[in-house]
Amino acid sequence: MAERFLFLDTETTGLSVTGGDRVCEIAVVEADEKGRAIRAFHTYLNPECRMNHVAQSIHGLSTSFLLGAPRFAEIQDEFLAFVKGATIVAHNATFDQHFIEGELARAGGPSFFGSVKKIECSWRRARSLLPVGKRSLEALCERFEIGTVDRSLHGALIDSVLLGHVWASLTALEKGGVMPLPVQANLTPEIRLALRQPRTPKLVWEG
């Protein structure tokens, strides 16, 4: 059976798990070997705490907006079923893993690391393949000429889609030693529709 790659991103209320910050949006996108999105799990979350104003300026999610969203404990079973046994790729993976482990611990769930096959960090991979230059998701999209026209704010869903393309570009670079051709971020009709609609605190399944 082919290895299943899932591209994950979270948005949070701040930067410190130990300081009480929580996950307020989570997305996991399954993509093929060319980075094209196949299906996705996405939801906003009620973090049950106030939003840091700096974090809000980055992702645009306010405390009041998230009040009607599900709590992590309400979606953890669906989330774990989606990621089970897969290889997870995240940009600065330690950050996302720590926050997700924190949410699972609060909800009495199992370990995230123990629920998946392995966790890969695209930032670390980029550092090994591209020793010079910036390695943020934005910088890598620019370097690989990946279109980001659907990205106005940081958002877990669009960032996960873009990460799939970045990972495919890094793989092509590693295998062939050449830069891949420019691409426009691939979005399924369902994902494109979700991104065009006003942000809504609603559980979204794609595919």
Give names to the regions the model predicted.
Residues 205-207:
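Charged interaction scaffolds used for protein-protein
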Residues 87-90, 94, 99, 103-104, ...:
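Acidic, Mg2+-coordinating catalytic module of metal-dependent nucleases/exonucleases
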Residues 1-117, 127-130, 135-154:
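Conserved non-catalytic scaffold segment of RNase H-like nuclease domains
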